[in-house]
Design a protein with these regions (language model features):
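Short hydrophobic alpha-helical segments that form membrane-spanning helices or hydrophobic packing faces
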Residues: 96-101
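An N-terminal alpha-helical hairpin/helix-loop-helix interaction module that forms a charged
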Residues: 1-88, 106-183
Length: 183
């Protein structure tokens, strides 16, 4: 279904092309371009894209992302000093960080979003494929293990993380629609 919808297929193709053209995270302008595209196509709500780009550049993530280092997700998601002013708290951009890492290394990084979360929770309630709490989905190490449990339970080992993600997202979007749907 995902690849049959031209909107999603072409968006994925565009992001793949962009990340192939700018695979490194050395130049702020390259990082800013990638952030802006992910932010627009995935509605990740990063209003301070320049600040996030500088943050990612300072982290020097290229070697770690290629190696599939799980800690990179949290490093990107936090420590950027993008503050929610009304409560004076740094925002956690976990969902964005999973997407940014995924587009650099789709074999080692899965994408987290509300649709994936709702789908995994619903499947676990019905089939008990893994022992997890809702908060575990926002811990990338645990999230990745939950996805492995899902793959094993449903005999999906021939499918990669990207294919599993697309299924979870499409299922969640269809079965757990939000009040606001971006076209």
């Amino acid at each position: 279904m995902f690849n049959n919808d031209l909107r999603y297929k072409l968006a994925d193709d565009a992001i793949n092309k962009l990340f192939s053209a700018f695979p490194e995270n050395k130049k702020v302008e390259d990082i800013l371009l990638k952030i802006s595209v992910i932010n627009d196509l995935y509605s990740t709500n990063i209003l301070a894209t320049y600040q996030m780009a500088v943050h990612i550049q300072k982290l020097d993530i290229d070697t770690k992302v290629r190696a599939g280092n799980i800690d990179v997700v949290n490093e990107i998601a936090t420590g950027h000093n993008i503050i929610r002013k009304d409560i004076n708290t740094e925002l956690n951009f976990y969902s964005f960080a999973t997407k940014y890492c995924n587009w650099h290394n789709q074999d080692d990084y899965a994408i987290y979003d509300r649709f994936v979360s709702k789908t995994l929770t619903a499947y676990n309630k019905e089939y008990s494929f893994s022992n997890f709490k809702q908060t575990d989905l926002k811990d990338f190490r645990k999230f990745k293990q939950i996805l492995e449990d899902f793959k094993k339970h449903f005999n999906l080992n021939k499918h990669n993380l990207k294919e599993i993600d697309k299924f979870l997202w499409v299922y969640g979007k269809k079965n757990f629609p939000s009040n606001y749907q971006k076209n």
